[in-house]
């Protein structure tokens, strides 16, 4: 049986991204992504969504999981950039 080590949760990732947005550490890719704006973030979300689909059709479950993690990251970057909170999204689940 494979042992899984939980590194991040959806909530902990959001907290990390929110912190980076507030503190703006030098050289942060997240800060650069936030500064690039909604158009750039939206393009990345579309790109990652396509990669999720391709991975689901043609790649391993590990590759699919990685692509999904990238889609979640970019979606949360957009949320932070737009000032949304997790609760704003949770209301619609």
Swiss-Prot record:
Hydrolase as UniProt keyword: yes
Biological process (GO) annotations held by this record are: L-histidine biosynthetic process
Catalytic reactions of this protein: 1-(5-phospho-beta-D-ribosyl)-ATP + H2O = 1-(5-phospho-beta-D-ribosyl)-5'-AMP + diphosphate + H(+)
A GO cellular component annotation here is:
cytoplasm
Q: Name one GO molecular function term.
A: phosphoribosyl-ATP diphosphatase activity
Q: Name one Pfam family in it.
A: PRA-PH
Subcellular location, record wording: Cytoplasm
Establish whether keyword tRNA processing is in the entry: no
| InterPro entries, alphabetized | HisE, PRib-ATP_PPHydrolase-like
List the pathway annotation: Amino-acid biosynthesis; L-histidine biosynthesis; L-histidine from 5-phospho-alpha-D-ribose 1-diphosphate: step 2/9
EC number, UniProt record: 3.6.1.31
Which domain of life does this protein belong to? Answer: Bacteria
Alphabetically sorted, this entry's keywords are: Amino-acid biosynthesis, ATP-binding, Cytoplasm, Histidine biosynthesis, Hydrolase, Nucleotide-binding
Q: Which family does it belong to?
A: Belongs to the PRA-PH family.
Its protein name is: Phosphoribosyl-ATP pyrophosphatase
Gene that encodes the chain: hisE
